[in-house]
Amino acid sequence: MSTLRLLLSDSYDPWFNLAVEECIFRQMPATQRVLFLWRNADTVVIGRAQNPWKECNTRRMEEDHVRLARRSSGGGAVFHDLGNTCFTFMAGKPEYDKTVSTAIVLAALNSLGVTAEASGRNDLVVKTDSGDRKVSGSAYRETIDRGFHHGTLLLNADLSRLANYLNPDQKKLQAKGITSVRGRVANLVELLPGITHQHICEAIQEAFFSHYGERVDAEVISPDNTPDLPNFAETFARQSSWEWNFGQAPAFSHLLDERFRWGGVELHFDVEKGHITRTQAFTDSLNPAPLEALAARLVGCQYRAEVLLQQCEALVGDFPEQEAELKELSAWMAGAVR
């Protein structure tokens, strides 16, 4: 019986693909070597310990229907579209070795006519007249008895969109995370015109089989043809939840300030695991009571635009004379945290 397993995803859903990856990694026999090939439609994928409000322009993502997905490995934020080919290599220890999986990807690129090399811990680069250009980035995860290496190959990605979603608004945001580094990148199609996702997948599969000296049939998976994995539904529910994608953010503080015709407002939020733990409100309004009441109501709430909007509008019954001001405040506040 082969120790290899090959999975190809027909789904562009990042939550589905990451849930498949997580399930297989947790449940695979320690003797198995797995290759999983996939790609995501418009998605910002963040590292396990990152703060989406710091790393991403969450407002623009919502406007453009770009999903947020938190992966289980560390590292920085990346933008995925269908111009990215994603790969995951998994193996039990002591066989797991990220230099092996890196060598497989380099061999695949070489078979297509692209000479690349590893650079630093995470990247693959090609040398051009204008300097080294990054064509692949990776992240890793290890447990006591297994590990995985996953990454992307830039095939024909819309590189102009990287800045759209990975450059946050210039908010007064103080966070305990580390800002991702945006390096110089290149698409493989610039080096090999006409190359496709299928070409890359076939090359990686062949390099995978060649390295291990055996072949297996591919398992093609999708939401309509899910792999036989215990607890997959629960894993998918977690992967697609707000609590995982946003709520796992490191603790941070956020300052909002604005001047309205009825007075200036300054709000200080302390946020942990996606929930507001402390709110301070300052205003020169002649009637500060609604803002003081709002500050008290928000403690314990999820740091979500719709939740802040609901809490603010709920005060109208207590302060009917300030209804117009509260509606103006709620619209501004919700827009500021998106």
UniProtKB/Swiss-Prot annotation:
(R)-lipoate binds at K134. The gene is lplA. GO terms for biological process: protein modification process. InterPro entries: aa-tRNA-synth_II/BPL/LPL, BPL_LPL_catalytic, Lipoate_ligase_A, Lipoate_protein_ligase_C, LipoylTrfase_LipoateP_Ligase. In the transfer reaction, the free carboxyl group of lipoic acid is attached via an amide linkage to the epsilon-amino group of a specific lysine residue of lipoyl domains of lipoate-dependent enzymes. Transmembrane segments: none annotated. Catalyzes both the ATP-dependent activation of exogenously supplied lipoate to lipoyl-AMP and the transfer of the activated lipoyl onto the lipoyl domains of lipoate-dependent enzymes. Pathway: Protein modification; protein lipoylation via exogenous pathway; protein N(6)-(lipoyl)lysine from lipoate: step 1/2; Protein modification; protein lipoylation via exogenous pathway; protein N(6)-(lipoyl)lysine from lipoate: step 2/2. One of its GO terms (molecular function) is ATP binding. Monomer. It is found in: Cytoplasm. ATP binds at R71, G76, A77, V78, F79, K134. Keywords: ATP-binding, Cytoplasm, Ligase, Nucleotide-binding. Belongs to the LplA family. It comes from the Bacteria. Pfam families: Lip_prot_lig_C, LplA-B_cat. It catalyses: L-lysyl-[lipoyl-carrier protein] + (R)-lipoate + ATP = N(6)-[(R)-lipoyl]-L-lysyl-[lipoyl-carrier protein] + AMP + diphosphate + H(+). GO terms for cellular component: cytosol. The lineage of its organism: Bacteria, Pseudomonadati, Pseudomonadota, Gammaproteobacteria, Enterobacterales. The keyword Magnesium does not apply. Its EC number is 6.3.1.20. It comes from Klebsiella pneumoniae (strain 342). This is Lipoate-protein ligase A. SUPFAM superfamilies: Class II aaRS and biotin synthetases, SufE/NifU. Residues 29-216 form the BPL/LPL catalytic domain.
